Amino acid sequence: MTNLSGSMPSSTAADLQPALRVEGLGFYYGTKKVLEGVTMAIPVGKVTAMIGPSGCGKSTLLKAFNRIAELEGRVKVTGKIEFFGQNIYDQKVNINSLRREIGMVFQRPNPFPTSIYDNIVYGVKLCCNVSRAELDEIVERSLTRAVLWDEVKDSLKKSALGLSGGQQQRLCIARALAVNPKVLLMDEPCSALDPISTLKIEELINSLRENVTITIVTHNMQQALRVSDYTAFFNTDESRIGQLVEFDTTQNIFSSPQETQTRDYVAGRFG
């Protein structure tokens, strides 16, 4: 169990240890209900996509996983989210430690207005007492994992703001990887990128999956098919506010969904 002081979609997934387990989750911003009765589990070492129309609560769930949603205002949580067996909303949980263990990459690249090098080491310096040599190793390793090292190794002291949009997003991924998270959350990481940069991010996701559990929110159905092992479909209408409609292997969600709403959504009939 990680020290920070849902049911599975198929028999195959049930054999996998969950990195995150959600049980009966309800989530409110103030008095506004955003999620209701969500139960699911994110298996370790897999990529899980969350899809659904705008406003269905998928990004809110992503932000609930590392409690960053609390930065957006007063929230109320019912039910439970466990991270390797520990309730992340327990009063004993250190939120900063949780956010190191569960990193996040946002829709638009958000590099700090500092050098490429300082972007990578920022989180490491906050949590750890390491030497300059160790920092240098972390920078190279993180940028290499993000498939960016060869492009920036001679420009580490230059501003990160001078990078292209795709490079900035890979830098943000490298920055998250620098503190060795167990889980990486991605909220539509390619929505602001061109097709070539999107391809590089998708290739990066595939290269990271063996070492980091990844959960990605995407509106791109083809992207979900390309990069994910499991897919969760959320929907919102007059009768279902922010509810999980179906969770299964990505292959099953797109080829043989069990719910009519899922079938209509992946076929492009709404959303």
UniProtKB/Swiss-Prot annotation:
Domain of life: Bacteria
Subcellular location: Cell inner membrane
An MF annotation (GO) of this entry: ATPase-coupled phosphate ion transmembrane transporter activity
Pfam families documented for this protein: ABC_tran (PF00005)
Gene Ontology CC, one term: plasma membrane
Membrane topology: Peripheral membrane protein
Keyword set, alphabetical order: ATP-binding, Cell inner membrane, Cell membrane, Membrane, Nucleotide-binding, Phosphate transport, Translocase, Transport
Catalytic reactions of this protein: phosphate(out) + ATP + H2O = ADP + 2 phosphate(in) + H(+)
All copies of domain ABC transporter, residue ranges: 20-266
Keyword check for Ribosomal protein: no
Binding site for ATP: 52-59
GO biological process: phosphate ion transmembrane transport
Family: Belongs to the ABC transporter superfamily. Phosphate importer (TC 3.A.1.7) family.
PANTHER family linked: ABC TRANSPORTER I FAMILY MEMBER 17, PHOSPHATE IMPORT ATP-BINDING PROTEIN PSTB 3
Assembly: The complex is composed of two ATP-binding proteins (PstB), two transmembrane proteins (PstC and PstA) and a solute-binding protein (PstS).
UniProt xrefs under NCBIfam families: 3a0107s01c2
The name this protein goes by in its record: Phosphate import ATP-binding protein PstB 3
